[in-house]
Swiss-Prot record:
Enzyme class (EC, first level): ligase
Complexes and interactors: Homotetramer.
Binding residue positions for L-citrulline: Y89, N125, R129, S177, S186, E262, Y274
One GO CC term on file: cytoplasm
Gene: argG
Lineage of the organism: Bacteria, Bacillati, Cyanobacteriota, Cyanophyceae, Synechococcales
Keyword Protease: no
Protein name: Argininosuccinate synthase
Cellular compartments annotated: Cytoplasm
Length: 404
């Protein structure tokens, strides 16, 4: 097997990726480890993380600002797709992985690296997402996965890193595994591994508890153009600004917490806690606007597409041909999704209280009203019902005779 000399490592500054640096050098004989730190709006001191990579033995550490790309190319398409895995999880973490993988491959090309590496364990979903994306974009590149191969527990990984002078970012008494980006936070491990234990309040950072959220409700209007959110409360905003503002508005009122049992790609069930206030709010508003601007059969079929889209992204097939085809269908439905949705935020709830589309609404008050302005032709109903139920009536008559 050809000796790997230069590796690009996806680096977060956490236990697993920090330990990967000396491990790659010692166990694989790698001479150069170049780390890539993705800025996804997580709010961390990325320069400090970059320096930690260098102190841990990296020959070079690159920080990439991916925030705009993350929102425009990944989060916004997910909003158009009303993406909710298992009808709950808006893929806040899953959406980030193909973007990071794309940049790993690009950097590997630029610096003529032999391989790319990541610190995902063998039990999680992210290993699948990284590997599938890297194989799709750089099928010639070798993928090295130290954390999947060394089979160390978190405690053992911390001890291994300490031998090489690598400080652990979490103590052995604080076992939570937390992933953060602009779209939200995911929390797992520790006490959360017991599905009957309530998630402690101190694990949440983006959302208020019901007790601490405002007693007075707040109404917000979200504006859409071609299925993309473009403003909040009559204020035009950039995509990143929209996510940030939606996070603050929804999070303040305690909306956006998810506590679920999740079906992982590797075949096990896991208990996951998510905070995704802004993304959930925007998806809820978008779905509501579609109800007034899309035909019933389009809404119905798009629901099937949305479920499959969410599954594909969750399972790591962002760069797959089926996902591309579903993107084309979803995009074709969104030219009519223009308008605004009014939502009341209060004590963990986001309640739709209004929706309108000036030029694309399929709702006609003169047809729906029961007042004297009603223009619906009631006399046509009897014939319609007769034809609509014809097959069922014939079936009933036949089966009635059979029983006799």
């Amino acid at each position: 097997m050809q000796q790997v000399k230069k590796v690009v490592l996806a680096y977060s500054g956490g236990v697993d990726t920090s330990v990967c640096i000396p491990y790659l050098k010692k166990e694989y004989g790698v001479s150069e480890v170049v780390t890539f730190v993705a800025d996804l709006g997580q709010g961390e001191d990325l320069e400090l993380i970059r320096q930690k990579a260098l102190n841990s033995g990296a020959s070079q550490s690159i920080v990439g600002n991916l925030v705009n790309s993350f929102v425009e190319r990944y989060a916004f398409p997910a909003i158009r797709a009303n993406a909710l895995y298992l009808d709950k999880y808006p893929l806040s973490t899953a959406l980030a992985r193909p973007l990071i993988a794309e940049n790993l491959v690009n950097i590997a090309r630029e610096i003529s690296a032999d391989a790319v590496a990541h610190g995902c364990t063998g039990k999680g979903n992210d290993q699948v997402r990284f590997d599938l994306a890297i194989n799709a974009l750089g099928p010639d590149l070798k993928i090295i996965t130290p954390a999947r191969e060394w089979n160390m527990s978190r405690e053992e990984a911390i001890e291994y890193g300490e031998k090489f002078g690598i400080p652990a970012p979490v103590s052995k008494k604080s076992p939570y595994s937390i992933d953060v980006n602009l779209l939200g936070r995911s929390i797992e491990a520790g006490i959360l591994e017991d599905p009957m234990k309530e998630a402690p309040e101190d694990i949440f950072a983006m959302t208020s508890s019901i007790e601490n959220s405002p007693d007075s409700p707040q109404e917000v209007e979200i504006i859409f153009k071609n299925g993309f959110p473009v403003g909040i409360n009559d204020e035009s905003l950039t995509p990143v600004e929209i996510i940030k503002k939606a996070n603050v508005l929804a999070g303040e009122h305690g909306f956006g917490r998810i506590d679920m049992i999740e079906d992982r790609v590797v075949g096990i069930k896991s208990r996951e806690i998510y905070e995704t206030p802004g993304l959930l709010l925007l998806i809820k508003a978008h779905k509501e606007l579609e109800s007034i601007t899309l035909n019933p059969d389009v809404v119905d079929f798009k629901g099937i597409v949305e479920k499959k889209w969410g599954q594909l992204v969750y399972q790591g097939f962002w760069f797959g041909p089926l996902k591309d085809s579903l993107d084309s269908f979803i995009s074709s439905t969104q030219t009519a999704v223009n308008g605004r949705v009014k939502i009341r935020l209060h004590k963990g709830n986001a309640i739709v209280i209004g929706r309108m589309s000036e030029n694309n609404s399929l709702y006609r008050e003169d047809l729906a009203t029961y007042s004297e302005e009603d223009v619906f032709n009631h006399s046509l109903a009897e014939g319609f019902i007769y034809m609509w139920g014809m097959s069922n009536k014939i079936w009933a008559e036949l089966n009635s005779k059979t029983k006799d």
